[in-house]
Amino acid sequence: MDNIEVRGARTHNLKNINLIIPRDKLIVVTGLSGSGKSSLAFDTLYAEGQRRYVESLSAYARQFLSLMEKPDVDHIEGLSPAISIEQKSTSHNPRSTVGTITEIHDYLRLLFARVGEPRCPDHDVPLAAQTVSQMVDNVISQPEGRRLMLLAPVVKDRKGEHTKILENLAAQGYIRARIDGEVCDLSDPPKLELQKKHTIEVVVDRFKVREDLAQRLAESFETALALSGGTAVVADMDDPHVEELLFSANFACPICGYSMRELEPRLFSFNNPAGACPTCDGLGVQQFFDPDRVLQNPELSLAGGAIRGWDRRNFYYFQMLRSLAEHYKFDIEAPFNSLDSAVQQAVLYGSGKDTIEFKYINDRGDTTVRRHPFEGVLHNMERRYKETESSAVREELAKFISNRSCASCSGTRLRREARYVFVENTTLPEISELSIGHALSFFQNMKLSGQRAQIAEKILKEIGDRLKFLVNVGLNYLSLSRSAETLSGGEAQRIRLASQIGAGLVGVMYVLDEPSIGLHQRDNERLLETLIHLRNLGNTVIVVEHDEDAIRAADHVIDIGPGAGVHGGEVVAEGTVDDIMAAPASLTGQFLSGKRSIAIPEKRVSADPSKVLKLIGATGNNLKDVTLTLPVGLFSCITGVSGSGKSTLINDTLYSIAQRQLNGATITEPAPYREIQGLEHFDKVIDIDQSPIGRTPRSNPATYTGIFTPIRELFAGVPESRTRGYTPGRFSFNVKGGRCEACQGDGVIKVEMHFLPDIYVPCDHCKGKRYNRETLEVKYKGKSIHEVLAMTIEEAREFFDAVPALARKLQTLIDVGLSYICLGQSATTLSGGEAQRVKLSRELSKRGTGQTLYILDEPTTGLHFADIQQLLAVLHQLRDQGNTIVVIEHNLDVIKTADWIVDLGPEGGSGGGEILVSGTPETVAECAASHTARFLKPMLQRKPQTV
């Protein structure tokens, strides 16, 4: 079959659509946010492809797989086995790294196990087991006539008189021994000091180097090796300063005897006990109770709350501190940072062996006196964290925990033996720390010889191929040791994309969700080449995408619309890019053809030089001591290639500092910096990201934006409610009273099907309405609470027109383009872009102070050109109220409308971390060193054709 045929697709908001999609082509599905793109690509095509494959497995195998719901579709023909590569499934496992996800680490383990050279950690001597023949050949190759002696070490650096050993050696017929470097007669050995370390080496043979000595030497070596347990030393008899020859029959260091078991791949795995560092169990970090987090307000007194939970409000712990104060004679009301350092140490780390008289007063007022050392606040927390069975206590204490690099393995995760195996004078941790780009050139330039080259050939090919794929999807700046949980959604998705190309499958349907997220325009071309390569292998590649370059590169485009939510779900246009541009109903086509565009502001808002936010000396991750200057009250854009340091500078440094100083947060530790100036211009900082507004089906736009509370109050105020004595709580589906108890206010009941997907059936009692019959009998303007929650925002705005507080909040949801979602729509069904706009609307609806610092990280993710236009209008509205907006963005439509741009670079990873240029878009566009400028300049020169 040449096509995938879809008939009657009705998943979510799709309106019974029919499609013929060409196979083995690059297909882009585009349209407004919430129009039904993911419903078609993921919830229909991928879900059915995966379901059909899984149904071919046995019932036993199916119970171990997470199954997707059967899509609401009449018929699909021509499907291949499907693989989805989404942004959501980033691993939160601290053991996952870029190297393990891509399987490069597995090949590196194999490489080091097969061609690695182990060395002694203390003496840097290669560990190698030698045969007696090799030892003999080495000695005979010395200059002829040289006088040598063969020694067998029997005692190495051990305390004692060793009388018995010396007597035994003499009894066995040995005449001489070298004791602590001096050769002496065993018939009259020196008296050794008991408390000193001694080395005793028996003289097994003395000889002049000659060619005919081979037989005699072989026998002597065998005797020496048997005596010493596998090591032998050959020393010059005439000149003690000549370097000695060390031999070992074991896989061991000939100097100290350090030995290793045979190299095997599991020794290089930090997820295996054989290779993991025993101190940190292969995590590379150790958790500890951080005094900086525990001491939240060192300028306060212990009584006044310097340590949360230990002040006078917590009687039990406070009386312990009072007893401590009496013992050490310090004032418990004095600021903590003014106390003597020894007292501070005792409070935090304990009194050591000092016993203190503690007075304990029970509930009845009886006093008990006990004497014991004080364990210290930090040790007390650590003990409670380990011993408690309460998840609430553990969660509370976890707030005071920080991570530090493991002291034993220096964060490399591997045990000592694995860290001292070398390939081309480089260890596995050193290779893992290289950026992917540098690692690729390291392996391309690797010169192995002989048998080692033959063994490594196939392994190196696999490593090289996988590194190339990662470079091709724009991830050359990441290191193989980078933890998976620190990756952005776009990075994680592109890593999995590279892994799929490495797998080399053919005849598969790949479904991708915006792979261009987090990717600079410079790297976009390489990503598209990768997708085309995947297609050329013989696969159908379906991409949900808004990026203009991706749409233009597609073989077939499907435009879903015309609007979003209930106004979408139809195929507006499909075919080639030209077909889309020619379709009058297609919004996408209008933006592609230039009939509509996002306008460049005629006049940019200029900065007030007296009001700036200045971050000085930021050095987190790859930042090279940069100073960031942002004008207050403007819309600023932070740009730069992927990995140049944007997130480190804004999220890890600026946001963390502002959160601590403005919002009083203590959880996040800012990345290193010297100084910050200008925070006095702000009263709070808000980060508006694309994380879900709630992780349970009970969370919805009405609860998140605060609309639900006044709605419940309205219902509680109607005469019927007053007569029945109903309070606003009666109209909540989260508490007993008004909700349906059969489904506990969910409206659906989950039925576990084990090897089939779990199904949710509407509750029989309330018919999916969430409330009991009595609650639903109460009507406001003829509608029950269930009917109000089922309204779209647009309908609700009209319905509550006479209630100003509600009308204002509903209007802001319409302003951000969410008129189509339902008030009670489950938060879990909202896309990332929709969740972000719900958050924006909540901010817009607040009575603003005009002194807020807003930080947004790639707000255009999942947004169509028309959605971006609407988002920019909202951001400009916030700016016009006096607020400061800082946006990390790659989208050129956003960048060109900014008042101020800060461009980082020039490259990613170690090649970045510098601020190349700051200024208006026009200033930045002239910077020769900037990759952003190269793409921004033509955008600023485009003549818009606005309609």
UniProtKB/Swiss-Prot annotation:
A zinc finger (C4-type) spans 253-280, 740-766. Residues 310-587, 607-937 form the ABC transporter domain. One of its GO terms (biological process) is nucleotide-excision repair. GO terms for molecular function: ATP binding; ATP hydrolysis activity; DNA binding; excinuclease ABC activity; zinc ion binding. One of its GO terms (cellular component) is cytoplasm. InterPro entries: ABC_transporter-like_ATP-bd (IPR003439), ABC_transporter-like_CS (IPR017871), ATP_grasp_subdomain_1 (IPR013815), P-loop_NTPase (IPR027417), UvrA (IPR004602), UvrA_DNA-bd (IPR041552), UvrA_inter (IPR041102). The UvrABC repair system catalyzes the recognition and processing of DNA lesions. UvrA is an ATPase and a DNA-binding protein. A damage recognition complex composed of 2 UvrA and 2 UvrB subunits scans DNA for abnormalities. When the presence of a lesion has been verified by UvrB, the UvrA molecules dissociate. Belongs to the ABC transporter superfamily. UvrA family. This is UvrABC system protein A. It comes from Yersinia pestis. The gene is uvrA.
